[in-house]
Every structure is written in structure tokens, then in C-alpha cells.
Amino acid sequence: MGRKKIQIQRITDERNRQVTFTKRKFGLMKKAYELSVLCDCEIALIIFNHSNKLFQYASTDMDKVLLKYTEYNEPHESRTNADIIETLRKKGFNGCDSPEPDGEDSLEQSPLLEDKYRRASEELDGLFRRYGSSVPAPNFAMPVTVPVSNQSSMQFSNPSSSLVTPSLVTSSLTDPRLLSPQQPALQRNSVSPGLPQRPASAGAMLGRDLNSANGACPNPVGNGYVSARASPGLLPVANGNGLNKVIPAKSPPPPTHNTQLGAPSRKPDLRVITSQGGKGLMHHLNNAQRLGVSQSTHSLTTPVVSVATPSLLSQGLPFSSMPTAYNTDYQLPSAELSSLPAFSSPAGLALGNVTAWQQPQQPQQPQPPQPPQSQPQPPQPQPQQPPQQQPHLVPVSLSNLIPGSPLPHVGAALTVTTHPHISIKSEPVSPSRERSPAPPPPAVFPAARPEPGEGLSSPAGGSYETGDRDDGRGDFGPTLGLLRPAPEPEAEGSAVKRMRLDTWTLK
């Protein structure tokens, strides 16, 4: 970009004239300095402005230069304005146009120099247009979370298909030439049993693989439970590749079945995933209602689930809110739970009401239920049991526990494999504070294998269940079976257990 061209004529504006004088005076003195240094000469510059104000410049001493000037009588070159204008016209320059110098540089700019600069600028522009597109863009990876709603219901017919309604699809906006580690993706299910996926964060989407069957990865949580703190809406529970169940927070679920078990050779995983999206889950319920039960004869081998999440009470879910001082990493080593008829009833298999008595070496015969008015009996001594075996608290959660859902296959039984020196008992709970029908007395059965036709009915509510939910209709009972062990290592006698049962019942 060249300098601004001005006409070489008197400037009428006082302010512009003063500015131009200051700039060009400094430029003239700068040129005189350069000339005196470069060419080893003496220069004396005397300037009077339009108001007769003196400005002078001397390379050495003004008096000495003026003395030499007055005493010099040799012929010399002397020029005026007319001589300069004539010289410029001979060289092809227009004497009427001159570039406006700045305060730092008063170098005269010729048209040849301008053409040179213009050609250089055009060449640079051509290079940018030619090679600008091949400049590699900066490589970056940006995880983008996109909610996806799958309208197809064919995914539930494949055992290895994952739940994507609603799901979080994590894509990376990255350069194809970039080989950077991808961010951990938020996925619903783990398709590979040996490589379970882990969630990237614990914000709006909490997911964890409770994969105790293959032992590929340990449980990262110390007490073994998955928090559901960011789930004000629905809580889907997924077992294995497709064993999915959706539990609404404050209303009874519709009579739907979405039971999809993996292959028999693969032990299914039990996963608890919470999400804040509710529309996609309602669409998932509609798809599951049309599908029905496809494969319900497979067995759930080793589920691991926790019922000690404190924030589930505020959601109104029928889970037990036991303190986390207990061992909450519960396992059911071999529980063939596929189709119990008692699971289909609304009040079947409630929390903490299944009483299983097992002596150290032999199972005890079934006993009739004790009335609440019976007197406590004195305790009887019983052989102590080794304290090194830690019993486990076993809650069982299946997708066919949804109330009001019929089961096509009946005949499987509940098998609880325990150590021969472990006594498993169940502590009863107080009567329900919700609107529910009159509860029948709890049934007592041995821990070996009950008959398929026997139902495990109990009251629909409990002391570990919240009683101030918004919708407490009686047809929505708990859907977890809970086997509670003795907290102390020394076992008690049957009379002491009956006394404790009566004491809890009277409360």
C-alpha cells in the first residue's frame, strides 16, 4: 500500500500546514544526518517557518559551517525550487505530486517502487490461493453427546443388541489423519463380556458394569453400589445384553415384558443406568409392550446389585434404604430365577419378608408362622460358627418382577447356594403404612429348593421403604427379594430367632 499522494502546493489549512511542516522538517533533518554520517560531510540547515521562527540543524558546529560558507569563493552548485522542478520533470516525475511522508520515514517513493511492491503483493496472493487449502488444519478431538431415539423394535430380537432408546452416542470431531486416544464413550450396555465399557462421567448419565461373572474388572466402588443421584425421572435396569427393565419413579409400571437374555454360554451382567431423559424411555416402554416375552427360560447366573443407595428414597422407588455399614457387594452365586409364579403377583417377594432357616449342617423343616402375641422364649445355646466366612445379602432383581405381568413358563425354582456354616435369616418389618390389602402371614420355607407352585407373599411395604411417596397405590409392590444374614459372626438358636421375629412384629 503506497503513501497518500498530495499536490505540491501551499496548504491553506493552518492545522494541516503545521502538521506537515513538523513531519517534513524532521524528515529533512533526518536525511541531513544520514548524509553527513554516510558521506563524511558538514551540513548546516537553516529553516524559517511562515511566522519567521528559526529552526536550524548543523552536523558539527553552525558557526564554523557558516564561517566556511562566507569565506568560500570557489564556484559551487547552487539550486532553487525551479531547478529542482526542472530536474524532476527530466527524470519523468511529476513535480506536482509527492507522497506524504510519515513522522518516522520521509523516503521518497517512486512509481517504479510502487510497481515492485504491487507485483510482490500479487505473487503472494497467488501463492496463498494455490497452497492455502493444503495447509493442515489443527488437530483436535471434541466429544459430542447426541441423544438418539431409535424407532425400530428389531434391536430387541438380537441378544447382542444394545439398548439405544434413549442412549448417548459419543462421536469425535477429529481429523482422519489424527491418531489420538478417544474419549471414553457413554454407552448403555457392554456387548463384550471381557471388555466392559466404563462411563466417562457421573453427571446426568451414570452407568456402571457390575460384571462379577468374568472377573475382567473389579468393582471400582468400595461398597459396591451405584449412585442414582442425578435421576429424577426413570431408572432403567439392564441385565446382560438385553435384559432390560424400566421402573417409573412415582407411578406403577404398565404390564409390559422386555425380557431379553443373552446366550446361555455368557453370564449376563447386571447394570444400573440412570438418565434424565424421559421421552425416549417412554418410547422404549411402548416398544417393549408390543414385543412381549421372547426368551424367558434362561437363567440369571450372577447378578450383583445394591439396594443401599440413599437417594432412591426421594425418588419413591421400592428399594431398601439400608445403611451402607453392611457389606453391599452382594452376590447370588447360582440363582436359577427365570419364572417363579409368585414373582408375577403385585405383592410377591417383597423386601425383607422371605424367611429362610438353615442350620450349620442340615436344613430345618418348615415351621408355621408365629402369631404376633406369642411370648419370647429363652435363648438356647448353639454351636458357634467360624467367623471367617462373611455372609452376603442377596437381593434378586428380574425383569419379570414387574407387577401384573403373566409368565408363560412355570417350573423353575429358587436355589440359594450358601456355605454350610452360614445361617441365613430374615428380619421382618413393621406393617405397611401405605394403602395396601391385608398382608398374609409370611411363609417359611427351607433354603434348599422350594416347590415351583409355592408363592412367596408378604406385605407390600416395609420399614425400610419410604412411606411419604406421592403415589402410594397398593398395586405397586416391591420387586426385590431380600435375604438378610445375621450381622454378628456367632449364630443364634431358633428360639432366639423366633423371639427376635416376635419383637420386630410387635413393633
Swiss-Prot record:
Phosphoserine: residues bearing it: S98, S106, S110, S121, S180, S190, S231, S251, S430
UniProt cross-references to InterPro entries, sorted A to Z: HJURP_C, MEF2-like_N, TF_MADSbox, TF_MADSbox_sf
PROSITE patterns: MADS_BOX_1, MADS_BOX_2
Gene Ontology molecular functions: DNA binding; DNA-binding transcription activator activity, RNA polymerase II-specific; DNA-binding transcription factor activity; DNA-binding transcription factor activity, RNA polymerase II-specific; DNA-binding transcription factor binding; enzyme binding; histone deacetylase binding; protein heterodimerization activity
Region of interest called Disordered, as start-end residue ranges on this chain: 174-207, 244-267, 357-392, 423-507
Domain (MADS-box) ranges: 3-57
Keyword DNA-binding: yes
The keyword Transmembrane helix appears for this protein: no
Residue positions, PTM N6-acetyllysine: K245, K425
Post-translational modification: Phosphorylated on Ser-430 by CDK5 is required for Lys-425 sumoylation and inhibits transcriptional activity. In neurons, enhanced CDK5 activity induced by neurotoxins promotes caspase 3-mediated cleavage leading to neuron apoptosis. Phosphorylation on Ser-180 can be enhanced by EGF. Phosphorylated and activated by CaMK4.
Cross-link (Glycyl lysine isopeptide (Lys-Gly) (interchain with G-Cter in SUMO)): K425
Cellular component GO terms held in the UniProt record: cytoplasm; nucleus
SUPFAM superfamilies: SRF-like
DNA-binding region per Swiss-Prot/TrEMBL record: 58-86
Primary localization: nucleus
Biased composition (Polar residues): 180-192
UniProt KW keywords: Acetylation, Activator, Apoptosis, Developmental protein, Differentiation, DNA-binding, Isopeptide bond, Neurogenesis, Nucleus, Phosphoprotein, Transcription, Transcription regulation, Ubl conjugation
Location in the cell: Nucleus
Skewed-composition ranges (Pro residues): 363-389
One example of a Gene Ontology biological process annotation: positive regulation of transcription by RNA polymerase II
Subunit structure: Forms a complex with class II HDACs in undifferentiating cells. On myogenic differentiation, HDACs are released into the cytoplasm allowing MEF2s to interact with other proteins for activation. Interacts with HDAC4 (in undifferentiating cells); the interaction translocates MEF2D to nuclear dots. Forms a heterodimer with MEF2A. Interacts with MAPK7; the interaction phosphorylates but does not activate MEF2D. Interacts with MYOG. Interacts with CCAR2 and HDAC3.
Record function comment: Transcriptional activator which binds specifically to the MEF2 element, 5'-YTA[AT](4)TAR-3', found in numerous muscle-specific, growth factor- and stress-induced genes. Mediates cellular functions not only in skeletal and cardiac muscle development, but also in neuronal differentiation and survival. Plays diverse roles in the control of cell growth, survival and apoptosis via p38 MAPK signaling in muscle-specific and/or growth factor-related transcription. Plays a critical role in the regulation of neuronal apoptosis.
Protein name in UniProt: Myocyte-specific enhancer factor 2D
Source species: Rattus norvegicus
